[in-house]
Structures are given as C-alpha cells and as structure tokens.
Amino acid sequence: MSFFEAETVGYVLRIKLAPGASFNGFRGVFCDEKGVEFLKGCVTAVPEKGKANKALIELLSKTLKISGSQISLVSGETDHYKKIYINTVASGEFSAKLSGLIKE
C-alpha cells in the first residue's frame, strides 16, 4: 500500500502533518497500526485557524509544481492525519512525482 491512490481523475494522498516544525518539507513514510501508509509532512506554521493546512497546500503546490487551486483538503481539518485531493490527470509521470516526495 502506498500513501497515495490514483482516482478516475486525480489522486488522494494520506499525510500525517507535524505543524510547528523547524522546517517545511517531507520526512518519509509513516505506517499506522493497521498498515496504512501516510506521507510525513512538516510545516513551520502553527495549527491555528487553518494556517498549518494552508501551509501544507502551499508546500505541495511548490514541490509538485502545480497550482494550489488543484489541491484540496478532503478530511482532517483539525487532525494530524489528513486526506488531500489533487485534481490532475492520473499518469505514471505524476505518480513518480508523488513517490519522489519520500526523498525530499
């Protein structure tokens, strides 16, 4: 299982976010007790009034080189565990970009 899944149009990512971190970036993959994988994300923004969620969307936009309007929070608005939807054409090239986030 991977931290992302291709949909008919786009991708759903599972991210475990650490707000208030010392840097913005990704730190590999976290596997929960059920074996579900989450990309570990870190943002310097604090978890107040959606600031950390906004910072995560900006980080994904910058790293994946896509518009922030293509990225939306599906669930986890007030939780460390997030589901993110990316509205883009599912392709091998974009899947490789997502896999590359682990190496960030």
For every predicted segment, state its role.
Residues I57:
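Generic structural marker for isolated residues within well-ordered, non-membrane alpha-helices
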Residues M1-K49, K54, S72-T78, K83-E104:
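Contiguous, often N-terminal, cationic amphipathic patches that form binding interfaces
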